[in-house]
A protein has these predicted regions:
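A short, Lys/Arg-rich alpha-helix, primarily the initiator
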Residues: 2-37, 307-336
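Tandem amphipathic alpha-helical repeat scaffolds
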Residues: 97-106, 134-148, 180-198, 225-239, ...
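Structural signature of alpha-solenoid helical repeat junctions
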Residues: 92-93, 131, 173-180, 218-228, ...
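Short alpha-helical DNA-recognition segment
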Residues: 38-57, 336-359
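Helix-turn-helix repeat elements of alpha-solenoid scaffolds
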Residues: 104-119, 145-169, 193-212, 240-252, ...
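DNA major-groove recognition helix of helix-turn-helix/homeodomain DNA-binding modules
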Residues: 68-83, 368-385, 629
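Flexible helix-coil transition and linker loops at the boundaries of alpha-helical arrays
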Residues: 83-87, 120-132, 161-178, 210-223, ...
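Alpha-helical adaptor scaffolds
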Residues: 185-246, 495-516, 521-575
Length: 629
């Protein structure tokens, strides 16, 4: 029997980390530990981005590190930002969305991209170095067929020098740069090719290509730059009449993208591999035929979802970032409190006036760190601007956690369990009982046991409730509106709802799914991407709607889910979402809609092959007779 979610408010244990909670304390502890381990001076990391003095003020909590600066600095020391959740201002999210729109149009709709770039520049008179670098890279791409090689060379150099102040042409390996900066350097290589300065282009390209390996970037970091390196490398080696090497680096890049389930620049890379493969007389090879199938599947998917085939990608992801105004408003609404009530402290004094809170909730202002933390604590949560997924100082532990999440996404349960056992040995004894660490361990162990059919659905649900209660009051589940929910909490809540569905409690399941989606819907519509918990919840909710024979609504949910997934670079769920669409269409009218569901099913198969998702490949194989014959 499942745990009573209407029980007493769960006491969430406050760790020492939480008691000492200051702005960014967890992040800076991790950042400093990693920097010292690698023997990197702070000045080397922050150079060209922010001053040493400004960084010290941020460390002391006197000011807040912007999301862009934080991401940029993390990338410079080779750490992906997926290991953290961030609470950011509405302006930062709007700026990201503006840049994303420019990125979408720059390759296929140049005039529209030019207008958007001009608008972005006009609205950002005082640009940061990072923003200026972005704009110059876009300007280079928009003018590459209009300007001379010399003009493009100057433009690309200027882009690099926005953030790189040291000698980067001769001694790149000694510097700490991120994928964003390597991209700008690749434009310098492209410019040198346009100037016919082949050897200079090769010398710089060779340094860029070797940089990720020299600095021991993990695959998740290399994924952000591998395709760009390959595409420029193909141009370079083709000019040097070494197309076999061009083909090889393209293959290596594609393999890394497939291992990471990433679509970052994959379509232009497939186009180039097919073109060069034909030049090498490989057109009849099984490998090239598979590339053609991938290319066709991507083309169908992009066409149906009105997404450009060719686009630019921003480095990193924004899927773990939350709008501070939406966070505070959701928490207040969940507690059914007025703005006046939350602006008063325990002694009855007003620490914030209603007008200020109203502007914060509307996204017009960002609260001070003190007010943000006071408000969130008052409403039952311990939040910070930057929060690691687990209470640890170890990047290795956070990386292993991400490996577990990926393995679970691929339904590789034995692998996930093995990594979890290794992770336990890496966690310090004093950290082992931390709420998020316990939550992660309990949830993964319960999910693994359920998958192996070693526990019943009811027992698994009880364990999910127990895992959730490590950080989240179970009483909140019975409220009219859910409060702000962190990534892992959302995934656990969705799985709880899905187990209600499996034991036939459809009303309970639907109620949770609907309220959970409401948490993410507003920001999903604004950013046009999914949150990890959102893609899980919508996928499982679609299954419930299918059980209820609400096929049209299920298809609508799956279409929204797929579109938002395609707007980010991770493709892990795409094969499953395409199959969901095929199932919706088949069940609604399998005679009338035959062409539609077959097209979806065939695409799903190609994406399962692309992701090397053996479980999904097998799942679809046994259903071929139903959908294809």
């Amino acid at each position: 029997m499942s745990m009573d979610i209407k029980g007493n408010l769960t006491e969430i244990p406050l760790s020492e980390n939480a008691i000492l909670h200051q702005s960014g304390v967890s992040f800076f502890r991790i950042f400093t530990a990693y920097r010292k381990e690698k023997k990197i001076r702070t000045e080397k990391i922050v150079s060209g981005v922010i001053s040493r003095r400004a960084f010290l003020d941020i460390e002391k909590g006197k000011s807040v590190l912007s999301r862009e600066n934080w991401k940029f600095l993390m990338h410079r020391i080779g750490i992906v930002t997926d290991y953290f959740e961030t609470v950011v201002s509405r302006k930062e999210l709007k700026d990201w969305r503006c840049r994303e729109d420019i990125c979408l149009f720059v390759c296929e709709y140049c005039e529209k991209a030019k207008k958007l770039l001009e608008g972005y520049r006009n609205s950002h008179i005082k640009m940061s170095n990072i923003e200026r670098q972005f704009c110059l890279k876009i300007e280079w791409l928009l003018s590459r067929d209009e300007k001379s090689g010399e003009e493009l060379y100057k433009l690309s150099e200027d882009a690099v020098c926005c953030t790189v102040q040291e000698d980067w042409k001769e001694n790149l390996s000694a510097l700490y740069v991120g994928p964003e900066e390597l991209e700008a350097m690749l434009l310098v290589v492209w410019s040198l090719l346009k100037k016919n300065e082949l050897m200079d282009a090769f010398r710089l390209f060779d340094q860029i290509q070797r940089y990720p390996k020299i600095h021991n970037w993990e695959p998740r970091m290399r994924e952000m730059i591998c395709a760009q390196i390959a595409l420029i490398g193909i141009k370079l080696y083709e000019r040097m009449q070494k197309i076999d090497i061009a083909y090889k680096i393209g293959i290596e890049s594609l393999e890394l993208l497939r291992q990471q389930s990433s679509q970052r620049y994959v379509y232009p890379l497939l186009v180039e591999l097919v073109r060069i493969g034909i030049m090498l007389e490989k057109e009849k090879s099984e490998e090239l035929q598979q590339f053609l199938k991938f290319q066709k599947a991507f083309a169908i998917l992009y066409e149906e979802n009105k997404i450009p085939y060719m686009r630019v990608w921003q480095c990193g992801s924004i899927e773990n970032s939350y709008d501070v105004g939406m966070v505070l408003k959701r928490m207040r609404m969940a507690q059914e409190k007025t703005q006046e009530e939350v602006c008063i402290d325990e002694k009855g004094f007003s620490f914030l006036n209603v007008r200020q809170l109203s502007r914060i909730e509307k996204g017009e202002n960002r609260p001070s760190t003190e007010n943000f933390q006071f408000l969130t604590r008052k409403m039952g949560r311990e939040l910070d601007w930057i929060m690691p997924m687990l209470e640890t100082d170890s990047i290795e532990v956070l990386s292993m956690r991400q490996d577990i999440i990926y393995a679970i996404g691929m339904r590789q349960w034995k692998k996930a369990k093995n990594i979890l056992e290794q992770l336990k040995t890496k966690i310090r004894a004093e950290d082992y009982k931390e709420p998020q660490i316990q939550q992660e361990i309990q949830f993964i162990e319960a999910a693994s046991l359920l998958e192996a059919q070693e526990i019943s659905i009811e027992e698994a649900q009880d364990r999910y409730f127990q895992a959730l209660s490590c950080t989240f009051s179970l009483e909140w589940l019975s409220q009219k509106e859910l409060p702000f929910i962190k990534r892992e909490e959302g995934i656990i809540i969705s799985n709880i709802a899905n187990l209600y569905r499996k034991i036939g409690k459809q009303e309970e399941a639907q109620g949770i799914f609907k309220r959970l989606y409401e948490v993410y819907e507003q920001q999903q519509r604004f950013l046009k991407i999914n949150f990890p918990a959102c893609v899980v919840a919508l996928g499982q909710y679609s299954g419930l709607l299918g059980d209820r024979k609400e096929y049209a609504y299920a298809l609508e949910i799956d279409t929204i889910n797929l579109f938002c997934e395609l707007n980010d670079f991770y493709l892990m769920s795409v094969g499953e979402l395409l199959y969901n669409q095929a199932w919706d269409i088949y069940e609604s009218d399998h005679i009338k809609n035959k062409k539609q569901y077959q097209k979806k099913f065939l695409c799903a198969q190609q994406f399962a092959y692309f992701n090397q998702d053996q479980d999904c490949i097998h799942f679809l194989k046994v259903r071929e007779e139903k959908y294809l014959k």
